[in-house]
């Protein structure tokens, strides 16, 4: 996903780690999920168009494979007709599959800082919280009336495109 995590985000996270701000790491991810809807519709439109039009397997990811890629997976599932509740449940399974790796990262950060850094502060950055995806969904619903309308209007994906996507990926 060509959505960069800029230096400003890194400096904000460093400020949290150093205790230079009261802002919580979670707030950065809430903001990012809102911005997927408000600022990156072109990226997600291109992503869905690739799924619709390309006849090759698709591998998509981002740094941790949960935020930018998680939203891409979520809107794909919505376009395929999966319920919002099921999409959220699927999104939350990310934590089940990454828990062991998250614990390793927390331990490495603590060790590398000689136990001077409170690596637990970063835990929300390493996993997912329901509020992250719900923020994206709520933003889409507020701006477009529904998630389906966000896909149709916000991402410029026609009913014919959605039908093609469903024919390609669904059986029956």
List where the protein language model places each region.
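Ser/Thr-glycine-rich phosphate-binding loops at phosphate-binding pockets of nucleotides
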Residues: 64, 68-69
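Cys-dependent protein tyrosine phosphatase-like superfamily
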Residues: 1-59, 72-172
């Amino acid at each position: 996903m060509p959505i960069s995590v800029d230096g400003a985000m890194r400096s904000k996270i460093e400020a949290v780690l150093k205790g230079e701000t009261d802002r919580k790491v979670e707030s950065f991810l809430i903001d990012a999920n809102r911005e997927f809807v408000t600022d990156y519709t072109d990226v997600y439109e291109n992503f869905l168009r690739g799924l619709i039009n390309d006849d090759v397997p698709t591998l998509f990811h981002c740094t941790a494979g949960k935020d930018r890629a998680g939203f891409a997976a979520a809107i794909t599932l919505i376009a395929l007709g999966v319920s919002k509740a099921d999409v959220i449940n699927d999104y939350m399974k990310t934590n089940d599959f990454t828990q062991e790796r998250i614990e390793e990262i927390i331990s490495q950060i603590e060790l590398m800082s000689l136990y001077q850094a409170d690596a637990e502060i970063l835990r929300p950055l390493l996993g997912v919280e329901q509020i992250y995806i719900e923020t994206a969904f709520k933003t889409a619903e507020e701006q477009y009336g529904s998630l389906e309308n966000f896909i149709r209007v916000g991402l410029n994906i026609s009913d014919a495109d959605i039908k093609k996507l469903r024919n390609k990926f669904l059986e029956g």
